[in-house]
């Protein structure tokens, strides 16, 4: 039975930085810098605890962020100096100005439940993007039934994975052991088909590429991650 405290994915902010401590942020940021280049104002959708915002702000970008979790928002505010950070949903957020670039890293769009929701979030984001602006959406594309176990600085994480082809859903039950306490929560990732993503993107006045591995390699349905890079035509 899922621990009531942690059945909601967005309540695990206390563990987020612990288990992302050794994530290759340098590689991610090199990729992002290459994609957004000379853009000045960046919006981070699903900013989490604010690591990307912190790096972008420190190299001179004007940044804003939003997250559905109030806990994440409060943690993110401690990592930035001037950034505005909002508690909001990517499906219907409203911000009073447009951005030159929009990023959404670490599988945020996988938390949507359908292609209709993906398109709704995409349309909303394009409405907030300047002409000739760039949007980067980082998607988890793993269809796995293999369990995962890892240890970070003595803290343990055991993840049970189940993929449902019928619903295009990756279901993960995650157990965190911090010291002597174990916490459990469950979340579902909607896994997108490359062809369907292309069909949606073709409806809009955009140029796009589906990449993988944080380099300029074309993604396919076997790629572990898909990075959707979109340019809003001017």
Descriptions of predicted regions:
Residues 196, 200-234:
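C-terminal lobe and adjacent flexible extensions of AdoMet/dcAdoMet transferase-like proteins
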Residues 136-200:
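SAM-dependent methyltransferase
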Residues 119-131:
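A short glycine-rich, Lys/Arg-flanked "PGG" loop and its adjoining helix->strand segment in the class I
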Residues 50-92:
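Class I SAM-dependent methyltransferase SAM/SAH-binding core
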Residues 94-101:
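A short acidic, Gly/Pro-enriched loop at the edge of an enzyme's catalytic core
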Residues 104-106:
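A short beta-strand submotif of the Rossmann-like class I SAM-dependent methyltransferase core
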């Amino acid at each position: 039975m899922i621990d009531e405290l942690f059945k909601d994915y967005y309540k695990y902010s206390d563990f987020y930085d612990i288990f992302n401590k050794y994530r290759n942020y340098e590689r991610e940021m090199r990729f992002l810098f290459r994609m957004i280049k000379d853009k000045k104002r960046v919006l981070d959708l699903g900013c989490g605890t604010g690591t990307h915002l912190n790096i972008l702000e420190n190299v001179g970008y004007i940044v804003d962020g939003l997250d559905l979790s109030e806990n994440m928002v409060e943690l993110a505010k401690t990592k930035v100096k001037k950034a505005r950070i909002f508690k909001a949903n990517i499906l219907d957020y409203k911000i009073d100005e447009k951005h030159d670039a929009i990023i959404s890293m670490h599988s945020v769009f996988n938390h949507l439940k359908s292609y209709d929701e993906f398109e709704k979030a995409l349309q909303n984001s394009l409405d907030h993007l300047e002409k000739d602006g760039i949007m980067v959406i980082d998607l988890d594309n793993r269809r796995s039934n293999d369990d995962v176990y890892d240890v970070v600085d003595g803290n343990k994480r055991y993840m049970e994975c189940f993929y449902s082809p019928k619903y295009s859903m990756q279901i993960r039950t995650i157990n965190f052991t911090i010291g002597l306490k174990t916490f459990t929560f469950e979340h579902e990732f909607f896994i997108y088909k490359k062809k369907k993503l292309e069909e949606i993107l073709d409806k809009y006045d955009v140029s796009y590429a589906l990449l993988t591995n944080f380099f300029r390699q074309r993604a396919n349905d076997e790629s572990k991650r898909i990075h959707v890079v979109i340019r809003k035509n001017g």
